[in-house]
Regions:
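Bacterial N-terminal signal peptides that target proteins for export
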Residues: 1-8
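Non-catalytic cap/lid and distal C-terminal segments of serine-dependent acyl enzymes
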Residues: 22-24, 35-68, 72-392
Length: 392
C-alpha cells in the first residue's frame, strides 16, 4: 500500500510539472520576442509587459541586485536593454518587474539553486565552451534507491557517457561520486555545475577517461530535492557533524552502483569529490575509507577553511589520528585535488591544509585556484580539472 501511495504521488507530481511546462510554453509563445540575444559583442534582453512601470535585469556578472540593468519600453509594450557581452562564462539572471523577481519567459534555459530559480546565459569562448552541448552527449538517469543506513528511499542522478551500454559486460567504467554544497541537492551538479556537458566534451576530446558520475543528495534527512514536495525525515546518523555524517555513500550508494552498473569494483576505479559542504563530506569519506577510494577532490571546503568563516581552526589530526604523525596510514591516494576561489575567504585554510599534506610527504597533491569567490564559476572549473587527472 505504501508503494502504491508513493507511485500515486509521483504521478500527481509529474502531471503538475507537465501542466506547468505547458503554461510556460504558452507564455513564451505569446511573448513573441527573442531574449536573450547574443550578437555583435552585445547581449540584448527583452520582456513583454505593457502595463509594467519599471523593468530591469538582475544578473550574476553584475552582482545581481547591486547593479541592475534598467530596461526601456517601446510603443508595443516590449521592454529591452542591451549591454556589452561579459567574458566567456555561464551566467544567470532574472527579470525584475515592479520589484518582483521572475524568470525571462523567452529563455527556456532555467537553473535552480536551492529554492531560487534563474535563467542561464552562456557566453561561448575559452573554457566556457566545455559548458555547451556536445555532439556526442551522454545520458542522465534519475535513480531511486533504498538507503538502509537512513531507512528511506532516496534519489540520485547517474551520468553515463556516450556509447554506454548497460548490457555490454566487457566494458567497465570508473565512477566519480560527486557531492553538492549546503543548500543544494542531487540536481545541483547537473544543472548549475554543467557536469554532463563538461564530461561529454572532455571525453569526446580525449582529455578525460569515459566515466560514470553519481550525484546523490548529500542531505541525509532528504528523500530527494525539496521541489518534489516530499517531506524530510528525522534521522540519527553514525557521525555527529554536518560534514561527516554522510556515511550512506559507502554503505548504500557504492554497493547499489556496483550491483546495477558495469563499473570497476576496486579503489582505483573510484573517486569522490565535492564543493563546500560536499568537499568536507568528501574529505571524511575518502580518508575514512582509504581502501575504497583512490582519488579525492575537495573544492572550497567550509570545513577545512572554517577558521576564516567564524569556525574553529580545522585539525585533521583530531579527526584522523596519525594523519600528520603517521601519514603512511593515509598516504595511499593517487590524486588529492584541492582548489578554491581566489576571493573565497576559505582559501587560507585550504592553502594551510595543502601545505601540511606536502610537508608530511603526501603524494598526488594538486592545488589550483581560480578567480572568483564561493561560486559555481569556480567549481565548474574545479570539476573540469579534476576529471582530467583521475583514472589515468
Amino acid at each position: 500500500m505504501k508503494k502504491f501511495k508513493f507511485i500515486a504521488l509521483a504521478l500527481a507530481l509529474v502531471t503538475s510539472i507537465s501542466g506547468f511546462g505547458q503554461e510556460m510554453n504558452s507564455l513564451m509563445f505569446r511573448a513573441g520576442v527573442k531574449s536573450p540575444e547574443v550578437k555583435n559583442d552585445s547581449v540584448t534582453f527583452r520582456f513583454v509587459a505593457p502595463k509594467a512601470r519599471k523593468v530591469s535585469v538582475s544578473a550574476s556578472w553584475l552582482g545581481y541586485n547591486a547593479n541592475q540593468l534598467p530596461m526601456t519600453q517601446d510603443a508595443n509594450g516590449v521592454w529591452s536593454v542591451s549591454t556589452p557581452q561579459p567574458a566567456p562564462e555561464l551566467y544567470t539572471y532574472n527579470i525584475v518587474v515592479d520589484g518582483v523577481t521572475m524568470l525571462d519567459p523567452s529563455n527556456v534555459q532555467v537553473q535552480r539553486d536551492g529554492s531560487r530559480y534563474m535563467n542561464a546565459l552562456l557566453i561561448p569562448g575559452g573554457y566556457a565552451d566545455q559548458y555547451a552541448e556536445s555532439s556526442k552527449p551522454g545520458n542522465v538517469e534519475h535513480v531511486w534507491y533504498y538507503s538502509a543506513e537512513n531507512d528511506m528511499t532516496r534519489r540520485m542522478y547517474v551520468y553515463t557517457p556516450a556509447g554506454y551500454d548497460r548490457n555490454n559486460k566487457n566494458v567497465k567504467y570508473p565512477v566519480l561520486y560527486l557531492l553538492h554544497g549546503g543548500g543544494g541537492d542531487e540536481d545541483a551538479w547537473s544543472t548549475l555545475g554543467r557536469t554532463c556537458q563538461i564530461l561529454d566534451n572532455l571525453i569526446a576530446q580525449g582529455k578525460a577517461k569515459p566515466m560514470m558520475v553519481v550525484m546523490p543528495n548529500g542531505n541525509p534527512n532528504q528523500y530527494a530535492a525539496q521541489t518534489l514536495g516530499i517531506p524530510t525525515k528525522e534521522i540519527t546518523t553514525k557521525y555527529g557533524s554536518n560534514f561527516d555524517n554522510y556515511s550512506s555513500l559507502v554503505a548504500d550508494i557504492v554497493p547499489y552502483i556496483e550491483k546495477n552498473y558495469p563499473v570497476i569494483k576496486n579503489r582505483k576505479g573510484r573517486a569522490v569529490a565535492g564543493l563546500s559542504m560536499g568537499g568536507g563530506q568528501s574529505f571524511f569519506i575518502a580518508f575514512r575509507n582509504v581502501d575504497v577510494f583512490a582519488n579525492v577532490g575537495i573544492f572550497s571546503s567550509g570545513l577545512i577553511g572554517s577558521s576564516a568563516i567564524g569556525g574553529a581552526p580545522f585539525d585533521a589530526e583530531q579527526h584522523f589520528p596519525g594523519m600528520y604523525t603517521n601519514p603512511a596510514k593515509y598516504n595511499k591516494f593517487d590524486v588529492i585535488y584541492l582548489a578554491c576561489g581566489e576571493q573565497d575567504n576559505r582559501i587560507d585554510g585550504m592553502l594551510d591544509f595543502k601545505q601540511k599534506l606536502l610537508d608530511k610527504g603526501y603524494k598526488g597533491v594538486v592545488w589550483e585556484q581560480y578567480p572568483g569567490a564561493h561560486e559555481w564559476k569556480v567549481w565548474r572549473r574545479n570539476l573540469s580539472a579534476f576529471v582530467q587527472l583521475i583514472f589515468k
